[in-house]
Amino acid sequence: IAINHLEGHALSPRLADAGLRFPYALLLVSGGHCQILRVEGVGQYRRMAATIDDALGEAFDKTAKILGLGYPGGPKVERLACSGDARAVHLPRPLLGSSEPHFSFAGLKSAVMRARDSGQHRGEDIAASFQQAAIDCVIDRLQRALATMGEVTALVVAGGVAANQAMRGALE
């Protein structure tokens, strides 16, 4: 059976919530994709934002590798971040405040590598600072997309990064 993976992410929330009605906003955050879509119906999607480099899940995985945590990186970075200080390491928030409808996480990943290489920061603090910077970027992009997409019935979050509790808390 041929199934479009991205369409599966866009429509599977309707299996969990039969009351979910079109149109709704979809924040898709995974290892391969980082997009905000207006889901208008089956087969009807309007992309409001997308990544221009690394997807968010990919950035989590690469951060885990930089910190020597292994794969899959998302849950490992999240666990390490719980014992860190998100304000301890100054990391960039790429495109924060920009009117461009894009995500960019490659520069954030590079900043994580520089922070590690400096030897001045604990891994826990780097993980927490990375996670917070990533969340700040997602929230900023999401707010901008929601302001321009028109009325929607709900915000749906899908993809592997949607399991991140800090991300879920920030989105609530």
List where the protein language model places each region:
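N-terminal small/polar loop signature for handling phosphorylated ligands or for N-terminal nucleophile
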Residues: 1, 13, 143-146
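Short beta-strand segments
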Residues: 3-4, 25-30, 37-38, 158
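Short, active-site-adjacent cap segments at secondary-structure transitions
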Residues: 9, 35, 162-164
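A glycine- and small-aliphatic-rich helix-loop capping segment at beta-alpha/alpha-beta transitions
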Residues: 15-21, 40-46, 69, 169-172
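A contiguous, well-structured pocket-lining segment that forms one wall/lid of small-molecule binding clefts
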Residues: 78-156, 161-172
